[in-house]
Amino acid sequence: MRVKKIASVLMAIILLVSIAGCSSPKKETAKQVKSESKERIVATTVAVTEIMDALEVDLVGVPTSSKTLPKRYKGLPEVGNPMSPDMEKVKSLKSSEVLSVTTLEYELKPVFDGVGIKANFLDLTSLKNMQNSISDLGKKYGREKQAEEVVTKLDKKVTSIQKEVKGKKEPTVLILLGVPGSYLVATEHSYIGDLVKQLGGKNIVQGEQVEYLASNTEYLKKADPDIILRAAHGMPDEVVKMFDKEFKTNDIWKHFAAVKNNRVYDLEERLFGTTGNLAAIEALDELKKMMYP
């Protein structure tokens, strides 16, 4: 319980610092027009905002982020960071629905419920779950065609890349998710863990149902993974320095086969987020290079 509590606190910190155009065709269906006329949707994470853009759905509010949001939403009111949206701001937008992610549901649902805001938490913890969420949004907002295009594109990529790695030796993998001063271990139930699984890799952490766990280096050493992936979020430059220091000063790391064989890789934050996103295709390509050099 203590380990899970620590992991929960660290995950909250990670999410706090890390998650921090086209016109519709003229032949719009009556369902689409009706939907857009009454829906006032607020997206509270960058990943969700990008998905709504791909579906060509308008929003009335977007998250506050250092990342560049889709042009479609330029100038829209910002509602704060994904971990702690400004509830007064959200309420002032008279939203009909607020979109967040299941990774934040435990922390945010009571807050939204407490102020009477209707929130929907999208499951972006894996490629398949993200595809299902996109399909559901397409049906809900009359954007079935756009949703099908996105889902099909992802399906084709997964099928193609799995054929490329079929028959190759499956590497064992350790995934570390870090913020300044600390880090967690990502399980196969995390988004990055799912990407590794899609490519045939075996996460050394098995039998867990949560996305992230507190680190136990002694246990990790016994598993001795072929590859170590280090994901840095929020302040990637600072986190990479933290990881470098940890690996140099903590004697245990030099005994890992992945370290001895120079198979420790830093993941680009733009591609490897804490939740699924539309950069998944590029992320799979990059991950394949690391897992099967």
Segments the model singles out, each with a brief description of its role:
Residues E39-R40, Q131-N132, D136-K139, E148, ...:
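Structured C-terminal subdomain patch of bacterial secreted/periplasmic proteins
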Residues M87-S100, I117, N216-R230:
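Proline-aspartate-enriched helix->loop->beta-strand connector
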Residues L69-K71, L108-D136, K140, Y265:
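Flexible loop/hinge segments that line or gate small-molecule binding clefts
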Residues K34, K38-L55, Q146-L199:
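Basic- and aromatic-lined ligand-binding clefts that recognize polyanionic substrates
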Residues L10-S18:
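Bacterial N-terminal signal peptides
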Residues P63, K67, S190-Y212, D266:
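His/Asp/Glu-enriched short active-site or ligand-binding loop at hydrolase and phosphoryl-transfer sites
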Residues S18-K31:
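Bacterial lipoprotein signal-peptidase II cleavage site
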Residues R40, T44-L93, E97-T102:
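A short, structured surface patch at a secondary-structure boundary
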